[in-house]
Amino acid sequence: VLAWVRQRAFFSLVAAQFFSSLADSALLIAAIGLLLEQHAAGWMAPALRVFFYFPYLLLAAFAGAVADYFPKGRVMFGTNLVKLGGCALLLAQVHPLFAYGVVGFGAAAYSPAKYGILPELFAPAALVGANAWIEVSTVVSILLGVGLGSFLIAPGSTVPHLLAAPAANATLLISVLYGIAAVFAAAIPHSTARAVVPIAHPWRLLREFRRALCVLWRDPQGQISLAVTSLFWGASATLQFLILSWAAQALGLPLAEAALLQIAVALGMVLGAMAAARWISLHRTLRLLPTGVAIGVAVLLMTLVTQVWVAATLLLVIGVLAGLFIVPMNALLQHRGQALMHAGQTIAVQNFNENMASLAMLAVYGVLLYLDAPISAIVIGFGVFVTLAMLLIVARHGVIRYRLSAVSACGSVR
């Protein structure tokens, strides 16, 4: 019976994540369409992503506590309703930046519950496989969401036209996906795991979050996995925009075709995640650190590419390496977090660091574009940064292993 309950909970979790992420991705395209219909300034389109990420920082100290205090399925249900509220604001002609920011608030509160429930359902040995399913469903939903959003706002598309404006009509249809996600979230059985957290005392929550942040950064395995996931997601957010600019200048591709190259990375991540679930166990995770160095080197090779098929192949390889790398690292971080604190706190700390890294790297990229830096130079700088950062992480891991082995040897002598 327990196995059946876990299977049902996991199916509902994956389905809720798929539809919610599908809607997030499609809604970004619809929000961009609304900006275009309003003849908004060009900088507002990438600013949508900033407004979406920023709530992750604002809610970092509180989202994990909420996910740990309430049943996580109920939290996922409520946060999908918040996202529905963001759609309603878009339909009410509230400025898209503000309305999409409300969706970001829902996503920020949703994430700790989504990942925090996994250690409650699975033993440590099964966490890599469970994470792989979540990552694969997320990547596939993002791919389909971009296509769905583009299709819904396209002139002459064969979708029901309930509203005259294409972008508003798309937003209305996308809101249905959030409703479906909420239904699946409501079907997740309530877990018996419930943390005692001072949810009514915000200042205590801030202190608890600060303590959780320090605990994870001081833990030998926690600090390595947290550094890696923060670097990866920051680099991934930047690479998403960098590929478009690089493909346009280096390969002469229009925007529509350049966007297809992002699919190569996403497909590679799916393959890498599936490989990780099949062959990588939790205790072997840190042996994959050199894979991060290989990703940085592969990015450097982009500057040598002059043909589209070579570019697609290289980006596919980058995606495979990334999927193979990040899924076990996520699982390791969740495992250490479960051992050191509550699951929701771990994911909140992870989100805080990852989104800080994303905003910082996107800001640097934006400044470089503002200064008219050549795209080839940006690609080289980006690849060198990832490579050197991973080499530092590998070196740090070596130092930690040496210290732990020395302490163990001293204990054995005594």
Cite the ranges covered by each PLM segment.
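Hydrophobic alpha-helical transmembrane segments
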Residues: L97-Y100, G104, G129-A195, I263, ...
